[in-house]
Structure formats: C-alpha cells, structure tokens
Curated annotation (Swiss-Prot):
Entry-linked PROSITE patterns: AA_TRNA_LIGASE_II
Descriptive protein name: Phenylalanine--tRNA ligase alpha subunit
GO MF annotations in UniProt: ATP binding; magnesium ion binding; phenylalanine-tRNA ligase activity; tRNA binding
One Pfam family of this chain: tRNA-synt_2d
Amino acid sequence: MQHLEEIIANATTAIDTADSLVALDEVRVQYLGKKGELTLQLQSLGKLPPEERRTAGQEINKAKGAVQQAIAARKDALQRAELEAKLAEETIDVSLPGRRIENGGLHPVTRTVERIEQFFGELGFSTESGPEIEDAFHNFDALNIADDHPARTDHDTFFFNPDLMLRTHTSGVQIRTMENGKPPFRFIAPGRVYRNDYDQTHTPMFHQVEGMLVDENVNFAQLKGILNDFLCNFFEEEVEVRFRPSFFPFTEPSAEVDVKRKDGKWLEVLGCGMVHPNVLRSVGIDPEKYSGFAFGMGVERLTMLRYGVNDLRAFFENDLRFLKQFK
C-alpha cells in the first residue's frame, strides 16, 4: 500500500494550486473518483492480512476525509474569489455624484391663490367654486348688471349663445352659494375667468378671487379693516393703503383699493364695496335685515407685484427658465 502521508501531501499541494473550480474538480476526481488514488487504496485492502485491514481501512478513510475537507475549503475560497471578482466588475462607485431627480414646484399663480386662501381661511372664510360656463342670470342679471352694460357685448365676453358664456368673473359663485344656503355667509371664490382682452397686462384667461361676507350689521369699516390686514399680510410688510370711490353695479358704495409703491406711486390692486340691495333681493335675502360686503382681486396682478414680474403673459408661456425661479 502506498504511503498515505505522501498521497495526502500530493493531494494537498494539488488542491492548494488549483486556480479554478474546474481544476479543483479534476483534483477531486484524481484522488476521490472511481479510479482515484484513495479509492484504489480502499480497493486494495483485500490483499492485506485480516489483522491489518481494520487499521489500514481507518487510516485510508481518515486520509479520504482530510482530502475532502481540503477540497471543500478550497472550493469555498475559489467561489468567494469568483464572486468578489464579479462584484468588482459590477461595482457602483457610491462616491460619484448621482443623477438628481428634479423636484417640481408650484406655479407662482398657484402659490398666490394658496396664500390668499390661507389668510381668509384663518378668518373663517370657506372656499367655494362654480362652473366656468355661466348663464346670463348668474353672470349678469343677479349681479345688477344692466342690459346695456359694456360687459354684455362680444368685445368683452366670450359667448356660446345669448344665454351661455365663459364667466367674466367669479361673482356667479357668490350668487350660487347664496341661492343654496341661508345667511350668514363668509366665503371666497377663486377660479379662472375669461375676457376678450390680450396685452402686456391682460390675457383672455386669468385668475380671480372674490370674497363675500353677509350678515346682520355688516359695515364698510369691517371691510376696510379686513382688506388692510390682508394686503399687509400678503406683502409681508406694513403697506400704505387707500380706498378710492368707484362704481360697480353689484356694490354700493363701491371703492377701488390702491397700495403705495416704494417709488411713491399708487397702484390699484382690488375692488370692493357693500353688496347692492338688488343683489341680495335676487337670491331672496332681505336687505333690510342683512347687509354685506364683497371684494375681488386679480391673482396675476398680485403675483406680479409680489414677485416683480413685468409681463403678465409670462405666467402662461410655460417657459421653464421663468418658472424655475419660483421653486
């Protein structure tokens, strides 16, 4: 019988020098296969005297176990090395700057509407909405707008037919809200409105917020106080405000509200007034018992003032270079 120590030494050397799983498997076959050296040693036990077979068999099995253990250890090492090499090829350098996912941002007009809603919401005003295609009653008649008023012409209004049009203001929401409820009322109505006009300070579609408060003993001083607080809050500074007498069919008395700019000039920002008794009557409210005030403002005008934008049309041209300034 060949000396087992020599076989183990040769097998160990072959195992340690195997540089791949294929080479290692060849070593396994060489020593443990059907015709492997250790297998032949086991088969030769029959040639030994009976008294030597037991001891020789134990030695051969011990040698076989040692070779199997060495092969298993080498196989594990080769598999780890192979995996590490594969991972090295596929590795991601986490120190490299990644591709940033660009976050979107709110449109400046949306920001302004939300700011207005937040202020009046804190005063208990709800937010109401209504259809953008309006009928003549809600857009004109119920608001005390005379039949010969210029707003009823094609020059100012987009008509579908004599009784249906794109709303020219959100005042129709005020009428619908009062029709469907009972006083007191305290709400604002933001939304898109449409007028046949287009230049540096006007677009055919723009955004408006109108507000209304109807209750007993409502007066103009309350209106002035709320609007003065709103403008100071909106511009985040104490601004000088003035109320100029004006005329609107749906309010009496009526006023236009100006703020004083840093250059000393006055700029109109909104209109307001006490709700006309005829408007209250049109929705079945007794003007002898209830009074109210209303106000309306162009959102784009306020947005232009807040962010220093000179051309209203820039809000609707979808120029990312412009819009990214407000993120």
